[in-house]
Amino acid sequence: MANGTRQKDLRERAERVIPGGMYGHESTRLLPPEFPQFFRRALGARIWDADEQPYIDYMCAYGPNLLGYRQSEIEAAADAQRLLGDTMTGPSEIMVNLAEAFVGMVRHADWAMFCKNGSDATSTAMVLARAHTGRKTILCAKGAYHGASPWNTPHTAGILASDRVHVAYYTYNDAQSLSDAFKAHDGDIAAVFATPFRHEVFEDQALAQLEFARTARKCCDETGALLVVDDVRAGFRVARDCSWTHLGIEPDLSCWGKCFANGYPISALLGSNKARDAARDIFVTGSFWFSAVPMAAAIETLRIIRETPYLETLIASGAALRAGLEAQSQRHGLELKQTGPAQMPQIFFADDPDFRIGYAWAAACLKGGVYVHPYHNMFLSAAHTVDDVTETLEATDRAFSAVLRDFASLQPHPILMQLAGA
């Protein structure tokens, strides 16, 4: 059970030595109380919590698991490099190999820099854009998440107004709003940040409209600002290239993280020659940015991305899950809103403004051995098989029945209600 003996003990111990018992996106504070906080192991598309309760995992570690947990070829590549060395006095030659492989796969890229987390990559892109242009203003979509750094975090504790004084906002997918933002900050825009599609928590996802993407490219070309696609979350889950490739739009910079080393800690900033001099001139670094083991894992992950039908597998599994859920929702009379790419689904219920239905459904799915999320977009991996989807749909069908059975007594999450009233 999610609240088994080991889980309870770990939560109690964590409360004493970790602020809040857990922090950041890994905290289960906003999830249903049944959700486990601690996990013991993972393999393929499955995770086991601290009490060895198994789940088919549709969060994939919030994205990093692309090809399956502990994928054998990637683990072998990482193990081989680990025997040679990981964090050393200087980088391994494998860093050059990885840069060559990455640049060879991403059409707009002429060079690569590596770091650890998505926030590292986006903050480096911000600094680079200001160095390249000599300007201050960064344009971001309202509500967009580009990491946890002070200039962009959605939270306010410890953040000063001055941290964001040179960040301005536009409405995602609204070409006119973007054009107006350029006019309002004429002559001082260093970069426009855009996610490949709208993928914020507690919101329906929205695919990028061509007019919006073209306007972003046009405004940057006309003003000398840099176009930055933040592909940290979506990278390699919608394309084998930058996620705006299908729109025919190439950015100047793209930010990558999460899955290109299949869970090993590494992120990247890729750029065109236009921004090479600025990339050379800025100073960004980290003690573990040059670790060789994640780079070895990344090289093998990129090889699998190039050479296998992993993406087609992702899309097919996502489509099968989406179709099955839609059929179940109609049969049970509980309308779903499924948005975004099927392999990165966001699932909400219609007429559920305080998310009480979605939370109850997610908790019922968990009881049935399926880990879904009530407010964050989810992720499929190439390890999700047809049998996994079939087993998932059996559990989700039971979850629909449980929600209907308990419908009159469903209550919203108390912390969500506190936040809504704040």
Curated annotation (Swiss-Prot):
<comment type="function">
    <text>Involved in degradation of fumonisin B1. Catalyzes the deamination of aminopentol (HFB1) to 2-keto-HFB1. Pyruvate is the preferred cosubstrate, but it can also use several other alpha-keto acids as amino group acceptors.</text>
</comment>
<dbReference type="InterPro" id="IPR015424">
    <property type="entry name" value="PyrdxlP-dep_Trfase"/>
</dbReference>
<protein>
    <recommendedName>
        <fullName>Aminopentol aminotransferase</fullName>
        <ecNumber>2.6.1.-</ecNumber>
    </recommendedName>
</protein>
<keyword id="KW-0808">Transferase</keyword>
<keyword id="KW-0963">Cytoplasm</keyword>
<comment type="similarity">
    <text>Belongs to the class-III pyridoxal-phosphate-dependent aminotransferase family.</text>
</comment>
<dbReference type="Pfam" id="PF00202">
    <property type="entry name" value="Aminotran_3"/>
</dbReference>
<dbReference type="InterPro" id="IPR015421">
    <property type="entry name" value="PyrdxlP-dep_Trfase_major"/>
</dbReference>
<feature type="modified residue" description="N6-(pyridoxal phosphate)lysine">
    <location>
        <position position="258"/>
    </location>
</feature>
<dbReference type="InterPro" id="IPR015422">
    <property type="entry name" value="PyrdxlP-dep_Trfase_small"/>
</dbReference>
<dbReference type="InterPro" id="IPR049704">
    <property type="entry name" value="Aminotrans_3_PPA_site"/>
</dbReference>
<keyword id="KW-0663">Pyridoxal phosphate</keyword>
<dbReference type="GO" id="GO:0005737">
    <property type="term" value="C:cytoplasm"/>
</dbReference>
<dbReference type="GO" id="GO:0030170">
    <property type="term" value="F:pyridoxal phosphate binding"/>
</dbReference>
<dbReference type="InterPro" id="IPR005814">
    <property type="entry name" value="Aminotrans_3"/>
</dbReference>
<dbReference type="GO" id="GO:0008483">
    <property type="term" value="F:transaminase activity"/>
</dbReference>
